[in-house]
């Protein structure tokens, strides 16, 4: 009886580990697909506008209004 209970517990632990690792690997794969997919690469090019070093006249006016 003790052996059967131990085997059951070990089986449950291994099954839980497998199901959690499957979910983690699935999320990692989704992230990789979103980064290297066509839409993902196009979306990354939009981030270049965020790091533009130039300040436009509208930005300067907005900063003056805030101050």
Swiss-Prot record:
Gene Ontology CC: extracellular region; membrane; other organism cell membrane
Domain of life: Eukaryota
Functional summary from the UniProt entry: Amphipathic peptide with antibacterial activities. Shows antiviral activities against the herpes simplex virus type-1. It potently inhibits the initial infection by provoking the rupture of viral envelop and the dissociation of proteins from the virions (EC(50) is 0.43 uM). It also effectively inhibits viral attachment (EC(50) is 2.87 uM), viral entry (EC(50) is 4.29 uM) and viral proliferation after infection (EC(50) is 7.86). Morever, it enters mammalian tested cells (Vero) and reduces the intracellular infectivity.
Keywords in alphabetical order: Amidation, Antibiotic, Antimicrobial, Antiviral protein, Cleavage on pair of basic residues, Membrane, Secreted, Signal, Target cell membrane, Target membrane
Positions of modified residues (Phenylalanine amide): 36
Tissue specificity of this protein: Expressed by the venom gland.
UniProt-recorded name of the protein: Peptide Hp1036
Major subcellular site: secreted
Location of the protein in the cell: Secreted; Target cell membrane
Provenance organism: Heterometrus petersii
Signal peptide feature range: 1-23
Residues excised as propeptide: 40-67
Family recorded in the similarity comment: Belongs to the non-disulfide-bridged peptide (NDBP) superfamily. Short antimicrobial peptide (group 4) family.
One GO-annotated biological process of the protein: regulation of defense response to virus
């Amino acid at each position: 009886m003790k052996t059967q209970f131990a085997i059951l517990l070990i089986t449950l632990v291994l099954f839980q580990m497998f199901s959690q690792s499957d979910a983690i690997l699935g999320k990692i794969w989704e992230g990789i697909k979103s980064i290297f997919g066509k839409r993902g690469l196009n979306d990354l090019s939009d981030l270049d506008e965020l790091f533009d070093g130039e300040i436009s006249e509208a930005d300067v006016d907005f900063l003056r209004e805030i101050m």
